[in-house]
Amino acid sequence: MQLNNSKRQMVLGGVAVLAAVAGAGLSQKKQAANLSMEAEQALWNAEFDTPDGRVLKMQNLQGKSLVINFWATWCAPCVEEMPLLDVFFRQNAAKGWQMVGLAIDQPSRVRQYLSQNAISYPIGFAGMSGTDLGRLLGNEQGGLPFTVVLDGKGGLIQRKLGKLSAQEIQAWA
C-alpha cells in the first residue's frame, strides 16, 4: 500500500509541475498577445487619407474587433485575398467587426484598383509610414500581405505575414 501511495504522490507531483509549467506558458502567451506601448500609440494615433478624400482615424476604431490588412496593388497575394476579406467584413460588420486596408502603394494605383474592384471596407493610403507601422505591429521583414487581428480590448488575436486562406479568415468570427 505504501508503494501505491508513493506512486500516487509522484503522479500528483508530476501533474502539479506540469500545471505550473503550462500556467507559466499561458502567462507568457498572454503577455506576447499584447502590443507594445509604442505599437499601440502609433496605431491609435495614426491617420490616413482615403481614396474618397476623407481622413481615416485609427482612434475611431479603438475598442472594436479590428482587422488591419497591409497590401499593395502590385502584390498578387494581396489582391487575391482582398475579396475574401471583403466577404468577411460584409458578413461580420453588423457583429461589431471593423476592417481597414492600409495600402503601401501610390494613391493613383490604389484608386485605379478600387475603381475596378468593389471593396466594402475602408482603405487608407499608408505609404512608407505604413511599412513602419507594420514593423511595430510585428512585420519585421516588411513583406506583404501582412494582417493583424485585434480584439475589442486591443489584444492580439492573430498576426500573419503572407496570404490568408478562407479558413483562417472565417476562424476569426
Task: Locate predicted features.
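Active-site acidic short loop of glycosyltransferases
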Residues: L61-K64, A94, S120, G142
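Structural microenvironment flanking redox-active thiols in thiol-disulfide oxidoreductases
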Residues: E80-A118, M128-R135
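A short beta-strand-turn-helix
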Residues: N45-L66
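Aromatic-flanked redox-active Cys/Sec active sites in thiol-based oxidoreductases
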Residues: N69-C75, I104
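N-terminal targeting signals for export/organelle localization
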Residues: M1-N45
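Thiol/disulfide oxidoreductase modules built on the thioredoxin-like
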Residues: Q116-I119, G127-W172
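Conserved hydrophobic/aromatic "anchor" residues
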Residues: A46, F70-W71, Y113, Y121
